[in-house]
């Protein structure tokens, strides 16, 4: 029991020490963090555009009509099944709420 208590105490003191260091660094880095936050949306947008372009190029290179037809067929069948089961689920919920 004593070793667990000492371990817990050590971890608490370690976390508190990092909190004190972190609060001092936050005051120093506020200007830098604001600039970083301003750059973040721009970099995310550029990464998203690059990823979209890469996927589009890959799709154009590997386009097969038979695969495309199969994908469209699977999508239509699965969306029909999902809408059917969603309707059944909705009816069940309404029946439970009304108490019929």
Curated annotation (Swiss-Prot):
Keywords tagged on the record: Chylomicron, HDL, LDL, Lipid degradation, Lipid metabolism, Lipid transport, Secreted, Signal, Transport, VLDL
Q: Which GO terms describe its molecular function?
A: phospholipase activator activity; phospholipase binding
Pfam families from the entry? Apo-CII
Q: Tell me the first and last residues of the signal peptide.
A: 1-22
Name where it's found.
Secreted
- From the UniProt record, give one GO term of the biological process aspect: positive regulation of phospholipid catabolic process
- Give the protein's biological function: Component of chylomicrons, very low-density lipoproteins (VLDL), low-density lipoproteins (LDL), and high-density lipoproteins (HDL) in plasma. Plays an important role in lipoprotein metabolism as an activator of lipoprotein lipase.
Family, per entry:
Belongs to the apolipoprotein C2 family.
Record's protein name: Apolipoprotein C-II
As recorded in Swiss-Prot or TrEMBL, the protein's gene is named Apoc2
